[in-house]
Structure formats: C-alpha cells, structure tokens
Amino acid sequence: MSKLLLLALGLLAASPTLAQTASPVPTGYTLKAPTDFDQYQPQVLETVAWLSNPTTPFGTSDRAAANRFLIEWISGSPTVSVGVEPYVMELTNKDSDLLTAFLGGWASYSLQHPNEKDPVVLNMEATKTVLAVYKNKGGKGNKTATELIKLNEQGKLPEWVKAHLSRK
C-alpha cells in the first residue's frame, strides 16, 4: 500500500511539470477573417509564455508548431504590427527560436498593452523575450545577446535599444 501511495504522490508532483510542457497551440485553427485572429489572442499569449518557459524543450515538433502558429498569427493579425529593426537580425543570429521570441514578445506585449505605441518600449519588451529564450538555450555563442543580458541587468537596455532604432 505504501508503494501505491508513493506512486500517486510522485504522479501528483510531476503533473504541474507535465502540464507546463503541453503545447498551447490550438488544433485545427483557421486564420483568415479578422475575428479568427481575435479569438486566438489568448492562445497567442499562452504560446509566447510556453515558448519562453525554461522547461519547454527545443527542437521538438511541438515547438515548431508553436513557432508556426505565432508567425501565422502575427503575419495576418489586424491588431498587432511588429517592427523588425536591423539590430534584430544580428541579435537573433539566424536562430529561428530567437526570431520567433522577438516576434512573440512584441505581440504579447502589444496584446497586453494595446495603447502602447512607443517603439523603444515595444522593442525592449521583445528583446527581453529574446534574452530569456537565449538563456534557456544555454546562453552561448551570441555576443550581442550576451552583451544585452549584461546591459539589461545594469538597467541600460532602454538606452541601447533607443540607440539602435532606425527611427528615433
């Protein structure tokens, strides 16, 4: 009986971890009409959070599906428009996970703060999402991201972002 109790407790303890790793991407979604995009806003927020979570594994079909969902939603959204500055390409360094993190971070912040139009704030929040995902990937091999992590810790990220915007 004590073995059964231990097994049950082990399963209960593991269930929050298992729940965190389940992809929030809706199945069979359609993104054509403006109302389609509106109805999936909660899943967009959940997907960005899921992709940024340290427990979400890289290189899986679930992660690829989440990236695809976000890019499709952002590409057609009538309410969110993401601005990709030249520095973003250097920061994401041809890493699709980091690029999707930037796009998702911007979209997530825009959805949660619909009146925010300041490009410094939007770029900074998107960049913070990139830095979180970069750390989750091990935080190696990208000098720009490593530099920005230090600047963020020093509270100097807003100045850096402002200096790297094409329109100030």
Task: Tell where the protein language model's regions lie, with residue ranges.
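Positively charged n-region of N-terminal signal peptides that target proteins for export
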Residues: 1-4, 20
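Sec-dependent signal peptide hydrophobic core
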Residues: 5-9
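N-terminal signal peptide c-region/cleavage motif recognized by signal peptidases
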Residues: 14-16
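N-terminal secretory signal peptides
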Residues: 20-88, 162, 168
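Mature extracellular/secreted ectodomains of secretory-pathway proteins
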Residues: 61-167
